[in-house]
Each structure stands twice: as structure tokens, then as C-alpha cells.
Amino acid sequence: VGGAPGLIIALLLRMFMPEPVRGALDARTAFSDETPTLKQAIATLWKSVAFRYLVIAFTFAGIAGYSINAFMTAFLLRRYELTLVQASVGYGLMYGATGLLGIMLGGAMADRLGKKDRRAYGWLPGCAHIIAAPLLILALTRTDVVWMAVLIFVPALLYTTYLGPGYSIAHNLVSPRMRATTTAILLAISTLAGLC
């Protein structure tokens, strides 16, 4: 039932929005139009030092994110004596809203700053995480739940800024025919490492 709106939107998009030509906006390069096998994709990605660093960055971000998410509901229950519904729904709504805003903000800022310096796609999320850490500590040490909720907004927003620029880096490392596989591999590695 919860996925029904997404299915409806997907059907509407399929009916009314044309599929863009793959790679139409990419600069013409020596990339092949053939779709590589999974083995070829993994071999290509493993050769890329930039991709390996990206996996490490995504993994550390995943560990931090999964840890905080696993911790927050119990923390809100014990520290502020909220009910389970108040803690889980409140944190879920806040995290969902700040996550969406953080992804959009991170992507937009990286694109803007990246016009002058392509390295912005990497250093912007790194700086955001460095700023977020002490702000998260500040928020979690508040004794008043309202102040905690207000103060946690910024680190929660900053946390997800890595997603847009990070996937952009990954997609720019490979041919258009490898982008979905690259995304899946990056997400699988960082998720598995983050959950372990």
C-alpha cells in the first residue's frame, strides 16, 4: 500500500515523459556503446583509484548514517521520554525532509562550485560532514527535546549532501552504459559495509 503512489507516478512518467537518449548530454568520447558484463564493469571500476576512494568515502558515510539512524529512536525514547510513535515518526519525518533537502542542496551547490573547480564534487561533501559532526554532538547533548530537534536539523541536512555529488563523480568515471551498474556496485558495497 505504501508504494502505490510511487507506482502511479512511475506509470504517469512512463506515459507522458519521453525517455532521453542515453549519453546525449555527454561529451563525445571514446566510450563504447556496448554494455559491459558485470565482471568487466567490476574490473574497470577496480582499476580506478578515484572509484576506490569514493567507495571508502561512501562506506564511512554509510557507517555514520546507519549508526545514527539505529541509535536515534532509542535515544529519543530514553533521553526525552517520548512515546515510540512520537520518537519514530518524528525522527522519520525530520530525517526524510532534511535528507531530501540535503541531497538537492548538495547536488546544486556542487554543480555551481564545480563549474570553477571540479574538485568541489569531492571536498564539498567532506566539509559538510566535518561541520556536521560537532553540530550533531551539540544537538544530542541538549536536555530539551525542542532545542535538540532544532539543532539536529543542520547536521541532518549536511549529512546527505554527499549523495548527489558522490553519484555524479561515479557516473563521470564510467561510460554511459556502465552508470547503472556503477551505482548498484557503489550502493551495495557501502550499504553492506555500513550495516556490518
Segments and roles (model prediction):
Residues 48-104, 158-167, 194-195:
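Extracytoplasmic gate region of multi-pass secondary transporters
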Residues 43, 52-61, 94, 135, ...:
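Alpha-helical transmembrane segments of MFS and MFS-like solute carriers/permeases
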Residues 114-116, 170-179:
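Paired intracellular helix-loop junctions of major facilitator superfamily
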Residues 3-27:
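C-terminal membrane-cytosol helix-exit motif in multi-pass small-molecule transporters
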Residues 21-55, 79-82:
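Juxtamembrane intracellular "pre-TM" segments in multi-pass secondary transporters
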Residues 116-166:
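C-terminal transmembrane helical hairpin of 12-TM major facilitator-type secondary transporters
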Residues 84-88, 176-186:
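Loop-to-transmembrane helix entry/capping segments in MFS-fold secondary transporters
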Residues 102-118:
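Helix-to-loop junctions at the C-terminal end of transmembrane segments
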